[in-house]
Amino acid sequence: MQGELTPLKDQVFPIPNCLICYMCKKKMKMKRSKSLSPKASNSEEDMKRTRLEETEVANDIITHPHILDFSDDVLLNIFKYLNPKDLMAISLSCQRLAQIVQDKTLWKRVDFREKPILLSDLKEYIKFLQPITTNLAIRGDLYRENDTELSPCFFNSIKNTCTQLKELIIEEYCINADKIQITDFPGTIEKLSLEGCKMGYLRSNKSYFFKMNFHMPNLTCLILSNCQWFTPHSLLVISKMPKLKELRLNSCHRLGECVAYASLATRFGFKTLEILDLRDTTLGDSEVGCFSCTKTLTHLYLECPSSLRNTDAGDQEPRPLQREILNQPPVYEDVNVAQFLVEDGFRWENYMFERCLITDRAICALGSDTCDRRIINNSAEGVIVVEEDKRIFNNPHLKTLVVRNYPHVTNSSLVHLASNASSLEYLDVSGTSVTRQGVETFKSQRSNVKIVTSFDET
């Protein structure tokens, strides 16, 4: 039967600005013939001619089937399995399919990331969006196109059209921070991803996410992976998000030594944070240890940057870090000073390479720990009475912990986690200095935990 199908180009007839397919033309011809009001005739010859035409049409449908023989409901059910780009291609074939493709049920979850979308083509994609569109994902190409800067018109179109938008994913585009503020994004979204985006014209005295907690009160997931413009002081603003559960900052290479910001953010914010991704950053023990105060944390991902692996501090060439301009103004958050840029003449030559590495100190800060016991009474000669041991449960619900390629993570971390991380279900210590014996001991104590090590790869 497939061999008898008529090619699509032979089934369509071009007319100005649109196409009429073979089946559409046949139906239109039948409608026109019925509207001509033929003369009344009861002759037997006319009846035979009518039956003959009906038989020919039926035989033609059987021998030359067309997709347009299906009803609109059947076609709509078929189209729901196609991706948005295929739907757009089908809409160009004929008028009937174009009308079906525009059905709002097909455009509730829209993901255009299969191929990069150039800015010149973006308008053609936006016109298919509907008020009930809840998910929108687009991807550009920073290396293919010189001008990939999103316009304010794009964000206005989304805000005005997609009034129920819950998820917005924008990858590998340029955003002009002087023209587009965080308040220009739809305030209804619950998930925002700017993975791989470039941000230009950022203000030095204010975080790009300033007052984001008021504009997006329902945001639960924020993905800023590979955003090289993200700076540590923005942690203070993000920590104020009242419903934030997932934060991904992996490959944000400017996220380095920031114990002051991390301490304030975790002490007064991140009250609902569950998933934290800090892989491929230069955060150290002090910063990671601050998140031990986040009681809701269940998933923590840490991995040493590839540029810092297998490197000995003594063998490194001096690499002084670039220093900020001395007279640059401080950064303000909510009228409070959040960041000072200080230049004290200290030469940052190979300043403690280990400072950028996670060690047992950070891992042992996670989970429960025994606090210092208070002396109750020492009045009796030679007798000191102290209070009973108390345990502080910092992360009682930590379920997933990934600590990869840190040479200063040893068996001490395994011993601590075996005793104190009671909710742990998954542990990845690949590339660390744990021993095979230490892993076997951990497995014997916590058989319910799936542990991934470098020994599994050999």
Question: Where are the regions a protein language model picked out?
Answer:
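CRL adaptor-proximal regions
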Residues: 1-69, 341-346, 458
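Short hydrophobic alpha-helical "box" of cullin-RING ligase substrate receptors
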Residues: 70-82, 96-98, 110
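Short helix-loop-helix/strand-helix junction enriched in hydrophobic and basic residues
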Residues: 72, 87-104
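Recurring C-terminal helix/loop segment of individual leucine-rich repeat
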Residues: 99, 124-128, 153-160, 180-184, ...
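Leucine-rich repeat
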Residues: 103-106, 129-135, 160-167, 184-193, ...
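F-box-proximal linker/hinge
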Residues: 111-166
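Structural position within Leucine-Rich Repeats
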Residues: 114, 140, 172, 191, ...
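Short, solvent-exposed loop/turn at the beta-strand->alpha-helix junction
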Residues: 116-121, 142-153, 172-180, 198-207, ...
